[in-house]
Structure formats: structure tokens, C-alpha cells
Amino acid sequence: MMVRIKVSHLIFLIASIIFIFISPYIFGDYGLNIVNQIAIFIILAVSYNLINGVTGQFSLEPNGFVAIGAYAATLVLLSADAKNDQFFLDGPSSFILAIHSNSFILALIVAGICSSLLALILAFAVFRVRGDYLAIVTLGFGIIIKIAAINFPSITNGSRGLVDIPQFSTIYWTGGIAIVAVILILNIVYSKYGRAMKAIRDDEDAASAMGINTFWIKTLAFSTSAFLEGAGGGLLACLLTTVSPTQFDFLLTFQLLIIIVLGGLGSTTGAIIGVILVIGGSEWLRFLDELNIKIDSLNLDIQSTPGLRMVVFSIVLILVMLFARKGIMGYYELSDVIRGIKKRFKRSKK
């Protein structure tokens, strides 16, 4: 597949590289941590958008693949001594004990491959169904992965999780990999495979009648999405330096769903905008979780309500679905917006 660089893509690339290199100088530790989270969620969102938005398959599996990637990368990076120290109740299996590498890139590749291989196997089951049934099957997959993480302590250390993971996820790694992920997804979207994915989204039966191998194309989108979600999970583990089953519940999938719907299903640019609004906004609205309101004259006493900010985002999602059903960008990309501005500018000059 030939790499295509449009003017808008070049602008995005240059602006992103500049932002990555100046971030350590303009943000404190807390701000830099949020920027790292945004970069990782961009990877997760654009990859999830490939299967859900571009290909039109209503899948609810991201938390499962992110969990697999996080655990796979962690088990590669932890030394044998660190594993023995942490698996103090149920010793690690001999295979888990033997796995070790200090290579961060290798750990991310292993994380991506593990998720992608499982996606290939899962595709034979999930793509026998469509629509709501597909959503239910993939939702079940995420739940199974979380339960497996709890009930296989010799592999995952169970509910105790794993800690002291090397913190490799600096802004240079997370930002750089996010750029690579975005460029990869954009090149897929604008390739013949991307056109086939869009045809399946618009009308799968018609796409099949035109000679498109719908199962193969959906599997390609699913496995590519899973690879990036797995790598993103590895990055997340190395940012937080800890993994546990509770980190990978359905809330993660729901958050990604809000992001791509808000930005516009099928738009990579929209997914990026959605990440900035949701992740950045959720940090800005963190005060809502700790909000205490007491007005004696009204006999009103509201104590802190954990999760209130997610209620706010749920309301935002409902409003978007009601008044802007295609999201902020719809199906459009940054290049389409620039093209539209150029056309209007030319018309105004005539």
C-alpha cells in the first residue's frame, strides 16, 4: 500500500511534531500526564473508529483488546525477579517467568500481535452476525477478558494486578506512535481497502454483490484495529506503571464510543477532536466528582458524587445524537474542510 501525503496531512504532521517537542517545556508534570493520555487515546480512538465508523460494524470490544495489550506488554517488560516478587500467592507459570525483554518497542509489538491474533480468531465468530447481535457478542468478549484476568492468577496475578512497570511512555513515545497510527489509518481509509470498508458500511449486501469479499475486509479492519488497541494498551500500562482488571471494564469502551460519536463516526479528524474534548474536558470537569454544595436557605446539601463528570458526558452524547447526529466532523476529514474553504474563497474572488 503506497503512502500518500496530502497537504493537510503534512500540516498535521509538522504541527504534531512541533507540539511534541515543546510540550515538556510548556506543561508541568500533571499537564504532561494529560497530554500523554490524550496521545494514547488518539491511538485507541482512531483504531476503534476504523471498525466502528469507517467499516460500520457496531463493535464493543476495545476494552478487551486494550487489556490484552496492557498485560502482554507488562509481562514482557517485567523481569523474572519482579514477577516472583509480585506473584507471591500464585507463582507465575514457567512460560510467563521465561518471557522478558527490556525493549519497549518489542513489548508493544508483542502487545499488538497478541490482540491482533485473537481478533483474527474472534472474527470467525463475530462476523457471522450483524448490528445489535454483533454488539452483544463483542461486549461479551470484553467481559470474558476481564473475568479471565481475574481468574488466571498464574498469568495476570489475578485481582491484585501488576505494578512497578517500567515507565517508558514519555510524550516522545506516545506522541510519536500516535502520529504513526493516524497516518496508517488515513492511508488505509484512502486506499482501495478503505473504499471497500466504506462500501460495507453503506450497504454490505450491495458491496458483496459488487464482488467485495466482505468477510475479509471486515476481518482486516478488525485485526488492524485490535493491533493498535493492543499497542495502545501497552502504552497505557507503561504510563500508569500498573495494570489490574478493574482498569479495563466497559467504561473504557463507553468512553471511546463517546469520543468517536462526538467527533463523527468515520472521521479520523473527528476522532482526534473527540479525544481532546473528552479526555481534556474530563480532567477539566474533575471538580464535579468532588463538588460539595450546601445552601442552608434552600435546605440543599449535595455531597461529592464520584462519576458525575461521566453523567455530564452522557448528557453531551445524548444532545449530540439529538441535534448533530453525524457529530462534529461527520464523515469529513481535515483535508475536506480545507478543500471547502478553498472553494468558497475562490467563489468570493469571482
Regions found by a protein language model. Name each.
Residues 1-350:
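Transmembrane alpha-helices and adjacent helix-loop boundaries
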